Structure formats: structure tokens, C-alpha cells
Amino acid sequence: MAGLLSTFDTFSSRRSESINKSGGGAIIPGQRSTVSVFTLGPSVTDDADKLLIATTFLAHSLDTDKQHSQRGGFLVSLLAMAYSSPELYLTTNGVNADVKYVIYNIERDPKRTKTDGFIVKTRDMEYERTTEWLFGPMINKNPLFQGQRENADLEALLQTYGYPACLGAIIVQVWIVLVKAITSSAGLRKGFFNRLEAFRQDGTVKSALVFTGDTVEGIGAVMRSQQSLVSLMVETLVTMNTSRSDLTTLEKNIQIVGNYIRDAGLASFMNTIKYGVETKMAALTLSNLRPDLNKLRSLVDIYLSKGARAPFICILRDPVHGDFAPGNYPALWSYAMGVAVVQNKAMQQYVTGRTYLDMEMFLLGQAVAKDADSKISSALEEELGVTDTAKERLRHHLTNLSGGDGAYHKPTGGGAIEVAIDHTDITFGVEDTADRDNKNWTNDSNERWMNHSTNNHTITIHGAEELEEETNDEDIIDIENKIARRLADRKQRLNQANNKRDISSDADYENDDDATAAAEIGGI
């Protein structure tokens, strides 16, 4: 029997592995679009010219009259300006199944006054019309930078801080947009300026070069429509992390932004592991958490199989990224969120009011997290040499810090769920045996669950020996008591409400005709 159950336990991970395994068929290339990328030729040496070209690329990327593929090409051109060899940068990181990059050089030609003295060319020919299209008159619908509203002199800024710092300020902001552009477009503008603040304080981004909100929204729209651009940026981060140690200041700043981009869209998955599993509390032995634990284990295997690109599966729109949504392991996620809102006050602002929230598991997570005994890790007691006296005093301090009011945190955010929590239903204090007898509670935990469970499944305790942290049977029974009492009270209130409705239904029916008549003559 044990072998049979172990087969079911590993089914989720083995199923995911078989689905993602290559079938060995022929690889048929898909259709690829051509995207133009512009790089600086050796004749462009003046810093003012370079900054002018950078702002020109940025302006074209925001031009809504252009195709999104063209706008994405201008952002690629801007990002490539950070490297001495843009061609090598694109060859290393720009290999993509969706696009083929065609590179054009921008050279200095003083005779061409209509196009600011520039010409677009390749090794074999010059492109007059492309040059006029790129450097001809262009109406900026909105300012690119907040400094333009204040008539800030970018040339003076260039003289003060130098070209690398000014270019770096622009490119870093493009990277910051990626943090929220794919996974949280609704909060893009707010998230951008929150992340930007650290770079403003350390002087990386000067105030005159801060993007306007419209610029941020425009870049975000291009990123959402051009997956090839996002793939290029992700490959840039992967290359930085795996093969280079001599990074420039700009590249180091990009890596800092990359820390925000990693695991974007995977917050629920990571928080479930952090608060639900790594805390190793006794509630993990509940049988209705077992399927979700197996699912989470298979997701961990999938995540690790992705290698260096695993943190980016959401922004890369990897086909498996939907499996990591918390709706696929709702009970374990709900329990983890209950633990989180108690252990981390910042998590109380996290949106937990979702349609798949399991309210009982959410409350259970809070209950075990507030319990003083469950906060003490027995796995470290022997290693640290904690005495019984010290452990008892620690338990006393934890009990005092918890407040002892037994209040629950309500789910936050999300209009799809409305939950009313009665704070007096369950208390975290220890009740007297006499009180339990008055409520007709039997000591047989199995009978309690059979009599008072309102769920479709019966919650049982099993596999406690699999936990690394030792658990006390009395703690488990106490948790059962608390949940069972709440379920029984809820069922009793529901029955009383149904009885009242049955009694009043006949009277309501008899008054229907009178109410209708009154409405017709304007009485109601």
C-alpha cells in the first residue's frame, strides 16, 4: 500500500516532466519579422551628438504613429548604446524566434544640414529616406523628461556629469519600467517611481532626466507588445550573471534593477514556500494540504529545471507560468497567507481576498502562527543548547507579544470575496476543561470532525513523523478543537437562520397581494 501511495504522491511532478519533455520531432522554424536597429558608427565621437541620438531613439519609441515593432527596435537601439560593440551585444543576447535584427550604422556627415549632420548607411550603401525619417522634423506629443517641463538644459547637465552618466540614467529607467510592465501594468506608473527613488537618492538618475508618466506608460506598452524586446533584456541579465565579472557601473545598476525583475509574477508561489512550508508548523500534517504540497513540489521541480531563466518565466510568458498561480494550490496558499499576515505586518497589505481563498485554512494559518509553542523550532533547541527554563521564558514573552486578544486579520483587497469574521468565535487562550464539557465536546477528535465538519472533505491528521520539527499531540488536538468549535457554531447559526426563514415565509406569502395593491396606488 505504501508503494501505491508513493506513486500518487509523485504523479504531479512526473506528469509535468512528461508534458515538458521533448517529443523528438522535427524542428520547424516559425515566421520571423525584421526589425531595424541603429548603432553609432566610428565617426560619431562628440558626446552631445551621442546624447542627441539617444533621446531621438527614445522619442521614436514613444511615437504612436509608428508600428510597435519599429518602436521596439528603437528601444533595442537605445539599450545597445551601453556597449562598445552593439553588434556583439545583439549577437550574444538577441537570438530570438520572433525577430531578425537588421543593423544600420549612423555616421557623421557635416554636409547634411537637414538631418543634423547624420547619415544612415551600411557597408555598401547610404539610406537617404531612412535618414530623413529618423532625423527629420518630429513633433513630440509629450515631454520625454520631467526636466523639459522645467526648461532644464540637458547640455549643461552633460557638461557637469558627462555622457556615460546621462546615458546610464536613461537606460536604467527603461529597465525599471520592465519591473512592472508585464506582470502589473495597472500599477506601472506608481511602481516605476517607487523603484526609481533609490536611484535618485544615490545620484544615478538626475532630476532633469527623470521620465514623465507618459513616457513610462509608452515604454511599458511597447514591452507588452514586443516579447522579443523582453527576451533580449532577460538574456542580458542572464549573461551578466553567468559569464562576466568586469561589469561597468551601468551594468551593475542594471543588475540591481534585475533583482526586482527576478521572480516577478511569482510572489504567491514564493510566499507559499516561505510562510507555508519553510515555517514547518504542525498544520502541514493535515491531509487536505497533502495534494497542494504535492503540487507545490512538482512546481519546484519545474522551476529548477528552467535553470538560469527560471526567475523570468512570467515575464517571458513561458507556457508553464500559469501553473504557478495560487489557484492551483488554494488550501496551502490560504494557510500560508494566514501565517504571513501574523508573522510579517507588511503582508497584511497583500491582496488575499481572492475567489479561491479557503477561509478555514486562512484562519488556521493565523491560529498556529499566533500560538507561542509553534513559534519555537525544536530542530534548533539541541544545537543551541536551550534550557527548559529559557524556553519557558521565551514562550511567555511570545504570548505577551501576541496580545492575547485572539483577533483575526481579515482578507484584504479583491472585490470578489466578502468575508465577515466574528472575533469572538475563536480565542487563542487555553480554555478550561469545564468550559469544553459545557459545550458537549468529546475527547474523540475523529468524532468531532465527523459531526461538525461543514466541508466536503474530512480533515484528518497524519504523517506527523515526516516533519523535521517535532510536534506535540496536545498542540494538534488544540488546533482541532478550535476549528471544530468554529465549524459547529457556524452550522448552528445557519440552521437557526433557516428555521426563521421557514417560519416567516408563510406570512410573507400572505402579504404579497396587499403589497402589490399598495404599490399600484402609490402606497409603496
UniProtKB/Swiss-Prot annotation:
Its main location: virion. Residues 505-515 have a biased composition (Acidic residues). Ncore is globular and carries regions required for self-assembly and RNA-binding. Ntail is an intrinsically disordered monomeric domain in the C-terminus. Homomultimer; forms the nucleocapsid. Binds to the viral genomic RNA. N0 interacts with the phosphoprotein (via N-terminus); this interaction allows P to chaperon N0 to avoid N polymerization before encapsidation. Interacts as N-RNA template with the phosphoprotein (via C-terminus); this interaction positions the polymerase on the template. Forms the helical nucleocapsid (NC) in a ratio of 1 N per 6 ribonucleotides, protecting the genome from nucleases. The encapsidated genomic RNA serves as template for transcription and replication; encapsidation by N is coupled to RNA synthesis. Forms the encapsidation complex with the phosphoprotein protein P. Before encapsidation, the newly synthesized free N protein, so-called N0, is chaperoned by P. Residues 405-524 are annotated as: Ntail. Belongs to the paramyxoviruses nucleocapsid family. GO terms for cellular component: helical viral capsid; host cell cytoplasm; ribonucleoprotein complex; viral nucleocapsid. RNA binds at residues 180, 190, 195, 260, 350, 354. Residues 4-404 are annotated as: Ncore. Keywords: Capsid protein, Helical capsid protein, Host cytoplasm, Ribonucleoprotein, RNA-binding, Viral nucleoprotein, Virion. It is found in: Virion; Host cytoplasm. The keyword RNA-binding applies. GO terms for molecular function: RNA binding; structural molecule activity. It comes from Human parainfluenza 1 virus (strains A1426 / 86-315 / 62m-753) (HPIV-1). The lineage of its organism: Viruses, Riboviria, Orthornavirae, Negarnaviricota, Haploviricotina. The keyword Ribonucleoprotein applies. This is Nucleoprotein. Residues 496-524 are annotated as: Disordered. Residues 440-461 are annotated as: Homomultimerization. Residues 462-471 are annotated as: Interaction with the phosphoprotein. InterPro entries: Paramyx_ncap.
